[in-house]
Amino acid sequence: MTALQADLVVVGGGLAGIVTALEALRAGRSVALVDRDSPERFGGLALWAFGGMALVGTRLQAKKKIPDSPARALADWQRFGELDPNDRWPQAWARYYVEHSATEVYDWLLQEGVKFMPAVNLVERGRNGEGNSVARYHLLWGTSRCMTLRLIEQLRAAGSGGKLTLLHRHRVTQLEHTDGRVSGALAIDEATGAEVHLRAPAVVLAMGGINGSHEEARRNWPSDRPQPKTMLNGAHPFADGRLHHLAADQLGAQITHAGEMWNYAAGFPHPFPHFPGHGLSTIPCKSALWLNHRGERIGPEPLVTGFDTHWLCQRVASQEKPWTWHLLNWRIAAKEFAISGAEHNQRIRDRQLLAFLKETLLGNHRLVRQMQQQSPHFLVADSLAELTAKMNALT
């Protein structure tokens, strides 16, 4: 067994783990970071995400004359997020985030060389205006992938001189504690089976959520909400809840609010899946007709994206069959169809400004043709009768 001593052990190489390790290194600490994935996929889901985030009271909002404030954002969150006023930790977290996201997220990222697109979007406003009351959704220029690669670069620079140890393809199987404090962890090299004994006066678990496991998601699904008959995985497959249960079983950690997940209603299988069950999330076209399995428009209230994603998920999950359709013409698709994530937004990801502006103005025919060629779930026909035949053949 190999032994390794550090000032800090970080379990999980996603965005939270990388930032935690980076800040510790800059404070003069030595860090051991353990991650299950390969070096090429270092960064977790952040490497593949689109890169939108809700931020409060930023300089960009002020420039756009958006009248936001921590008090206003907290009121929106408490109302739309249905936070229990007596629930201590969710209330404390929400308050801290709205009061510090401008400095500790927006300003901090700017200092790291990360750039935002010059627009702030109003999403999740609620079906009747009960959600976000002002625009808060900031978008990264370069997507989350660019940000993640930049922070990894900074991490390696801060860890030069031997202060940073990166253990890829390692899985933590045990947490150790001494005198009531976590004092280390046992990690397994998943390629060789070799064990590594990590010791540190501080251990940070940054292992993501539970949505990488369908079993864990279903186990925690709120009983008062319709559960979908089939699901795809748009999270990270290693965010499977194992370490949550390990911390609970070995150390008495409390797992709360696990059923409050953020899911999406309009997914389809990835044409070239990175892992079993890998799904892509479309940004539903507002001008499309959202149909059930019989080809009937779901209603009477239409399903429209950008207002209440949580409600969309419940409406789709309550349908008789586990699939729905978006019906639209090519013109609408070229102007409105989009897929969330860095992989299918290369104009933004690769910061190709002119190409991005061209596709925004003239339509993204490239993406529509790409999906037509690659995905059997993206059906194109010259007539409604021909399209109906293809839809019936698929289901």
Describe every region a protein language model picked out.
Residues 194, 198-268:
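Glycine-rich loop(s) and the adjacent beta-strand/alpha-helix scaffold that form part
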Residues 16, 39, 296:
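Conserved Rossmann-like nucleotide-cofactor binding loop
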Residues 52-98:
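Glycine-rich active-site loop/strand segments that organize a redox cofactor
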Residues 21, 25:
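Gly/Ala-rich phosphate-binding loop of Rossmann-like dinucleotide-binding domains
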Residues 26-47:
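Glycine-rich FAD pyrophosphate-binding loop
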Residues 2-16, 32:
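Beta1/beta-strand and adjacent pyrophosphate-binding region of the FAD-binding site
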Residues 42, 94-196, 214-217, 268-269:
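Conserved redox-cofactor binding core of oxidoreductases
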Residues 253-394:
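An anion/pyrophosphate-binding glycine-rich loop and adjacent beta-alpha core
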